[in-house]
């Protein structure tokens, strides 16, 4: 399964390490090592599931976007 990790803070970086080679891309508007700045820029055919590790205020829009596009979603708790 190809995984997109959204948010490269402490938890996001941990998730990248755990998912390893299954990570197809990362998204973070502030981390220069991320593959993309915005989730909208990631091709939908590039991943099957996403791990959302963002601040709480950003989660709802991201989760809605992923679900509308038929993606599996794992969300870090607040």
Model-inferred region functions:
Residues 1-36:
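N-terminal Rossmann-like dinucleotide-binding module
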Residues 35-78:
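Beta-loop-alpha module in the N-terminal Rossmann-like domain of NAD(P)-dependent dehydrogenases
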């Amino acid at each position: 399964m190809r995984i997109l990790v959204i948010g490269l803070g402490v938890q996001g970086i941990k998730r990248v390490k755990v998912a390893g080679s299954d990570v197809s891309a990362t998204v973070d508007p502030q981390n220069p090592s991320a593959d993309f700045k915005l989730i909208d820029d990631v091709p939908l055919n590039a991943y099957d599931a996403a791990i959302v590790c963002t601040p709480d205020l950003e989660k709802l829009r991201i989760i809605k976007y992923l679900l509308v596009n038929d993606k599996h979603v794992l969300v870090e708790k607040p």
